Amino acid sequence: QLQQGLTRAFAWATDITPTILSFAGVELPGPRYAGRPVLPITGKDLSPVLMGESDRIYAAHETVGYELTGHAVLFQGDYKIVVNQPPAGDGQWRLYNIVTDPGETDDLSAQQPQRFQEMLSGYETYKRENRVLSLPPGYSQMRQLFSNALQERYGANITVMILALIVLLPFFI
């Protein structure tokens, strides 16, 4: 029986699939599907929390990491380290207690240096295990977004157009 109300249990997007599969009575897939290798599902089944059997899914020592275009985060227990790259941030890691400071206004990295370093090490482990690539120097999200949009819109034609522009430009200058 699903419990009504709000839970304070930590959950992440990766937990949705195992939870739905659990409620549907479907086993998690193995390492192969239709003869092809598949990546493992990394999330956890939230049904014990949703059924009122547990108040948390992740133990205090377990970590959940995430990275997108250089912005990165690692959750562990009540804490979170986060880095936001320019222009949204300054590229500096920060530590927050997300239970007592959900607005993330009080950076605890200087007050809790040991926890901060342990979580940075945890993020490096996440990065290595998940083959997260470091961004090249000078990386710009906006430039990459623009480049991807051009490539999607014009495909291989964009390369031909740029080369033609380079060849023909001297005749117009």
What are the language-model segments listed below?
Residues 16, 21, 81, 86-92, ...:
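Long, internal low-complexity/basic segments
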